[in-house]
Amino acid sequence: MSNKVHLGHTARKRFGQNFLTDHNVINRIVGAISPDNDHVMVEIGPGLAALTEPVANAIDKLTVVELDKDLVARLQEHPTLKDKLDIHQGDALQFDFSQLVEEGRQMKVFGNLPYNISTPLMFHLFEFAEQIENMHFMLQKEVVLRLSASPGTKAYGRLTVMAQYHCQVMPVLEVPPGSFTPPPKVDSAVVRLVPYKVKPWPCKDVDQLRHLTTTAFNMRRKTLRNNLKHMISDEEFAELGIDATLRPEQITVEQYVAMANFVVDKQ
């Protein structure tokens, strides 16, 4: 049997499917997620239910968002899960997660995310950060390094700034390729993202922050002066106390927020 077949389902490359099969890793992830009935528990991409089963067994109801119609059909017919699951067939990138929130209950979101959509999905989920208690995701190890990076490092970029603006970022564990069927060509890791209840650096317009960081990091090797000259002058950088000769990866999240707020105030 092909190593791309697991429990009778053939992994689909276009959906980025790699199914988690290592029970030790599964148990550690479920422990980190800490399922409970006080939150709306939401899984993105349940796949073949490696995380779905142990989480659903610990709670009354689990909401899942799955794109693959074949996998949705399997979940709908699953002997022990079908009565516990609230299944939404569709694309998580387009999904309105706010519809899942109940009065007095925030979401806990988790999933073994398809690596080909993990970054845009993060940006989509940040839009619902105020309604989320925490998130636990299996990601490409490189993405976890980017999420948790410090200024001045190669991994630090637009994703870092936006993630750390919205959330505390904590790597949980590293997962080798052999923990999956089929094994991915890259190492994986689990990360915990905890949205701030009160943001350390409030931004007046998050869209402006997103635009400014995208513009700054479009050309990483150039200076802020070069990349942001249409938005902030040398005199204005001086007013902000930011060295315009620095490169984008040398600027802290707090400084990016200060620049975005400055641009908003100028408009």
Curated annotation (Swiss-Prot):
EC number: 2.1.1.182
GO CC terms in record: cytosol
InterPro entries in the record: KsgA/Erm (IPR001737), rRNA_Ade_diMease-like_C (IPR023165), rRNA_Ade_Mease_Trfase_CS (IPR020596), rRNA_Ade_methylase_Trfase_N (IPR020598), rRNA_adenine_dimethylase (IPR011530), SAM-dependent_MTases_sf (IPR029063)
GO molecular function: 16S rRNA (adenine(1518)-N(6)/adenine(1519)-N(6))-dimethyltransferase activity; RNA binding
Function per UniProt: Specifically dimethylates two adjacent adenosines (A1518 and A1519) in the loop of a conserved hairpin near the 3'-end of 16S rRNA in the 30S particle. May play a critical role in biogenesis of 30S subunits.
Residues reported to bind S-adenosyl-L-methionine: N18, L20, G45, E66, D91, N112
Record-linked NCBIfam families: ksgA
Family designation: Belongs to the class I-like SAM-binding methyltransferase superfamily. rRNA adenine N(6)-methyltransferase family. RsmA subfamily.
Protein source organism: Shewanella woodyi (strain ATCC 51908 / MS32)
Domain of life: Bacteria
Catalytic activity: adenosine(1518)/adenosine(1519) in 16S rRNA + 4 S-adenosyl-L-methionine = N(6)-dimethyladenosine(1518)/N(6)-dimethyladenosine(1519) in 16S rRNA + 4 S-adenosyl-L-homocysteine + 4 H(+)
Enzyme category, top tier: transferase
Name of the protein in its database record: Ribosomal RNA small subunit methyltransferase A
Keywords: Cytoplasm, Methyltransferase, RNA-binding, rRNA processing, S-adenosyl-L-methionine, Transferase
Subcellular location field: Cytoplasm
